[in-house]
Swiss-Prot record:
One of its GO terms (biological process) is mismatch repair. GO terms for cellular component: mismatch repair complex. Transmembrane segments: none annotated. Residues 368-413 are annotated as: Disordered. Gene3D superfamilies: 3.30.230.10, Histidine kinase-like ATPase, C-terminal domain, MutL, C-terminal domain, dimerisation subdomain, MutL, C-terminal domain, regulatory subdomain. This is DNA mismatch repair protein MutL.
Length: 653
């Protein structure tokens, strides 16, 4: 039996580093938070090769005395708490005394620090072991340089993401910290290029402009509220400025970025049903009595335990509701200025070229895209909330459509209304149709859920829809039959399936027809989004979006695909947002994602079809890759056999 023994200090530091230091972004977070706790008003972060080669954080804080440097790199040595009372009244971002020891255990670290006296101190550590300490010259403050991260833990190094992804994680964490501390001037540079600089003047809206762009900042609303326990201040976007994920929601508690599902839900509740299943851009800064907050529950302190959470949630919801009360919902989603020259951007209406440019690209494209800022995991509660929101919106839309149908056209279309030439379309054989039409490529999608009223044999035949005889139309649904079976067709889902197949086929064959612009459109992005999209320009071109890097977090669009319908600027923004929030990591999956999103946007309303149009829809469904569902998995066709109908009416009992 193995004997119990005490682990060495170096080994315990490496174990602790496994919890605290996960990647280069973790190093940046810990060092910047230390600088904030040292009362710094200016902090500069520089990384080389996405932090994999070197990370440097310099501040003008209080510095460390020469005789305290060794203690600073010892585990559980800190200046921030003294006793148990301090542990439950934490007013600093750090308090465990693990950060520097954990970093030094897995990297080469050099520190240059001064308290403002005549002599500064320089020291170096590697693998948790001190290499040297000497006097040096430096202004007041501290500069810590971390190199060769995980050099002695190759397994950890192996599982890091690509340099691009690791850089985006650093950008994300610096953005969050900057939003939580507008009073501090923060600079982030990568390989000598400045990615972010905040002024440190305490103006939160100016920081939002620096991080997310000026146009976003202009559409942010101030929220304020307080009660005896909490003070709330922040900015939330207008209801018509949304994103596809929660990544643009930042909740800061006593200056610390946290993840809290209930508080995020309270923010969404303040919008009511205005978001349409999407998410706002928001920065909520909450000040609370430290006694109400327990931050000692998670290694990275992103998750906290909060007393009176329900009271705080109500405070947030009411503040957001009040801020949105006077919002003009008729305002446009995005106001983009056309490009005139590189020194002047005038607000002019863009004109479209009358000609359609055929741009065919023979070269195949493959691009790895990773999801970087992982959103909070969706729980059953999240899915339930989103489903309820979508169902309410659909019910409201259906009521309006039914009202329009009653006043504009009969709900039922009888076959007697179909012309003789349409009867030919209805009755021509499957083989004959295949010869006359160009079938679209089969959809190699994932496994889909079966309809509750279809048999296993039906599921095996899912890729083939028989030639149906149209019976009629009611409320946007088609009724048809084949060999005694009744088929119910949701025309919106069916049209979306056909639209999806058509768009995907053109994308996969790289046969995008493009509409050119006389004046390029300017799109501004946050630092995070810009860095991600800049590497996806080849993919955007394959999608039919001719965009070029214009610098300063800006892209120019010269043309767009003709399958993109509706208001161009809005549709392009939504498409780019979908790409940014996607977790897909290969080009083919992203093409399917884009095609599905475009089909959903292009087909959104039920309409009354003529007999010929309804018959043509049924005929085209026979060539669909999966006629029974649209790309999102929503049922398009349901078959009811005579046996199913008998069961519904409980015959035979």
């Amino acid at each position: 039996m193995a004997k119990i023994h005490e682990l060495s200090e170096n080994l315990t530091n490496q174990i602790a580093a496994g919890e605290v230091i996960e990647r280069p972004a973790s190093v940046v977070k810990e060092l910047v938070e230390n600088a904030i706790d040292a009362q710094a008003s200016r902090i500069r972060v520089e990384v080389q090769h996405s932090g994999l080669k070197q990370i440097s954080v310099q501040d003008n804080g209080s510095g460390i005395a020469p005789d305290q440097v060794d203690l600073a790199f010892m585990r559980h040595a800190t200046s921030k708490i003294q006793d148990e009372h301090d542990l439950f009244n934490i007013a600093t971002l750090g308090f465990r005394g693990e950060a520097l020891a954990s970093i030094a255990a897995v990297a080469h670290v050099e520190i240059l620090t001064s308290t403002g006296g005549q002599t500064a101190t320089r020291a170096a550590f590697a693998g948790g072991v001190k290499k040297f300490q000497e006097d040096a010259g430096s202004a007041k403050g501290t500069k810590i340089t971390v190199g060769d991260i995980f050099y002695n833990t190759p397994a950890r190094l192996k599982y890091l993401k690509s340099p691009k992804t690791e850089l985006l994680k650093i950008v994300d964490i610096v953005n969050r910290i900057a939003l939580g501390h507008p009073e501090i001037s923060l600079t982030l540079a990568s390989d000598g290029k400045v990615l972010l600089r905040t002024p440190g003047n305490g103006n939160l809206k100016q920081d939002v402009a620096n991080i997310y762009g000026r146009k976003v900042a202009e559409k942010m609303l101030t929220v304020e509220n307080e009660d005896p326990d909490f003070t709330l201040y922040g900015l939330v976007s207008e209801a018509n400025l949304t994103r596809s994920s929660r990544n643009f929601i930042s909740i800061l508690l006593n200056g610390r970025y946290i993840k809290n599902y209930q508080l995020s839900s309270a923010l969404l509740d303040g919008y009511g049903n205005k978001l349409g299943g999407k998410y706002p851009i928001a920065v909520l800064a909450i000040e609370a009595d430290p006694l109400l907050v327990d931050v000692n529950v998670h290694p990275t302190k992103e998750e906290v335990r909060l007393s009176k959470e329900k009271e705080l949630s109500r405070l947030i919801t009411s503040a957001v509701t009040e801020a949105l009360m006077d919002e003009d919902e008729a305002s446009p989603l995005f106001q983009l200025t056309p490009f005139k020259d590189k020194t002047q951007l005038d607000q002019l209406e863009f004109n479209l070229k009358p000609n359609v440019v055929d741009t065919r690209r023979p070269d195949d494209f493959q691009l790895e895209v990773s999801q970087v800022a992982e959103p909070e995991g969706k729980t059953d509660i999240t899915n339930k909330k989103e489903t309820e929101t979508k169902e309410k919106a659909e019910k409201k839309e259906n009521k309006q459509e039914e009202k329009e149908e009653k006043t504009s056209a009969p709900e039922y279309v009888d076959l007697n209304q179909v012309r003789e030439d349409d009867q030919y379309v209805l009755t021509k054989s499957w083989d004959q149709h295949v010869k006359e039409q160009t079938a679209l490529p089969p959809f190699a999608g994932g496994e889909e859920a079966a309809s509750p009223v279809t048999s296993k044999a039906d599921q095996l035949l899912r890729q083939h829809l028989p030639a149906l005889r149209l019976l009629g139309q009611m409320g946007g649904y088609l009724l048809a039959e084949h060999e005694g079976d009744l088929y119910l067709i949701d025309q919106v889902a069916a049209r979306r399936r056909l639209e999806y197949d058509q768009i995907l086929a053109s994308l996969e064959k790289d046969e995008n027809y493009q509409q050119g612009l006389l004046e390029p459109l300017v799109f501004d992005f946050s630092v995070y989004d810009y860095q991600k999209l800049k590497d996806q320009l080849p993919l955007l071109r394959q999608l039919g979006l001719e965009m070029e890097d214009f610098g300063q977090n800006t892209l120019l669009m010269h043309s767009y695909p003709t399958w993109l319908k509706g208001e161009v600027t809005v549709q392009v923004r939504e498409l780019l947002d979908q790409l940014l929030s996607s977790r897909e990591n290969d080009g083919k999956s992203l093409l399917k994602l884009v095609a599905a999103k475009a089909a959903e946007s292009n087909v959104s309303r039920r309409v009354n079809l003529t007999g010929a149009e309804a018959a043509d829809l049924l005929l085209r469904l026979q060539t669909a890759s999966d006629p029974y569902r649209d790309a999102s998995g929503q049922l398009a066709v349901v078959r009811l056999s005579q046996n199913d109908l008998s069961k519904l009416f409980k015959k035979g009992k």
